[in-house]
Swiss-Prot record:
Pfam families: MRP-63. InterPro entries: Ribosomal_mL63. The keyword Mitochondrion applies. This is Large ribosomal subunit protein mL63. Belongs to the mitochondrion-specific ribosomal protein mL63 family. Coiled coil: none annotated. GO terms for cellular component: mitochondrial ribosome; ribonucleoprotein complex. Keywords: Mitochondrion, Ribonucleoprotein, Ribosomal protein. Signal peptide: none annotated. Its main location: mitochondrion. It is found in: Mitochondrion. GO terms for molecular function: structural constituent of ribosome. It comes from Danio rerio. The gene is mrpl57.
Length: 103
């Protein structure tokens, strides 16, 4: 009975792969290859980021025209959704049938 309780108890407390006293993962050749590939990609990204595509003069206001065009598109879409104006004069115009200026 005591042996059964001892064998069916929970395992080692905590998680074996996380924490301060975790079990270290074995370093395989695939892990090394992936790390090297990632570092090479990062070095290439740093290379291209370090060289600007445009000068500061070219960069200043280069998207202003596109941004203005996009804002006009958004504004037109909003106005298309909005119902058109209704005036009281148009709705009550039928009441003016017999109204004339005194002559």
């Amino acid at each position: 009975m005591f042996l059964t309780l001892a064998l069916l108890r929970k395992g080692i407390p905590g998680k074996q792969w996380i924490g301060k006293y975790r079990r270290p993962r074995p370093v395989t050749w695939q892990i090394k290859r992936n790390v090297i590939k990632r570092l090479e990609q990062e070095a290439e990204n740093e290379y291209w980021i370090s060289r600007p595509f445009m000068t500061l003069e070219q960069e200043r206001g280069h998207a202003a025209q596109r941004r203005e065009w996009m804002w006009q598109q958004i504004k037109a879409e909003r106005q298309a959704k909005f119902p058109e104006h209704k005036y009281i004069a148009d709705q009550l115009n039928h009441l003016r049938v017999t109204k004339t200026w005194p002559s």
